[in-house]
């Protein structure tokens, strides 16, 4: 078991900002199309984080053209260029799955005041 821990530690990224459910983030994803690569930005609300270590993932939700889109990203994935926290959300839950059923202003999250 200790051998796996040392392998996992080598794969961990150190440039991950502190974010949690309710925060609005921009995830800059490296997309490879043939021989070219480009960066695509996915901005949305983090609705949950799960796992720990190398296996940790987070789910980001946004509404695009009146259709809800959710993407799950591994936190320590080499495909992610960087993560940028846009706003901090003031929520009382670790998983915000109830946002899937809400529309319009009801799906808005209050911004945390510093």
From Swiss-Prot:
One of its GO terms (cellular component) is cytosolic large ribosomal subunit. It holds the Pfam family Ribosomal_L19. The keyword Ribosomal protein applies. Keywords: Ribonucleoprotein, Ribosomal protein. It comes from the Bacteria. InterPro entries: Ribosomal_bL19, Ribosomal_bL19_CS, Ribosomal_bL19_sf, Translation_prot_SH3-like_sf. GO terms for biological process: translation. GO terms for molecular function: structural constituent of ribosome. Gene3D superfamilies: 2.30.30.790. This protein is located at the 30S-50S ribosomal subunit interface and may play a role in the structure and function of the aminoacyl-tRNA binding site. HAMAP family: Ribosomal_bL19. Belongs to the bacterial ribosomal protein bL19 family. NCBIfam families: rplS_bact. This is Large ribosomal subunit protein bL19.
């Amino acid at each position: 078991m200790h051998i796996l821990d040392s392998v996992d530690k080598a794969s961990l990224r150190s440039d991950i900002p502190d974010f949690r459910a309710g925060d609005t983030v921009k995830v800059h994803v490296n997309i490879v199309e043939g021989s070219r690569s480009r960066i695509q930005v996915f901005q949305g609300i983090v609705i949950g984080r799960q796992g720990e270590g190398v296996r940790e993932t987070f789910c980001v939700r946004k509404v695009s053209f009146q259709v809800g889109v959710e993407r799950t990203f591994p936190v320590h994935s080499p495909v992610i260029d960087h993560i940028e926290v846009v706003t901090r959300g003031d929520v009382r839950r670790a998983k915000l799955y109830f946002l899937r059923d809400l529309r319009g202003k009801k799906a808005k999250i209050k911004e945390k005041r510093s």
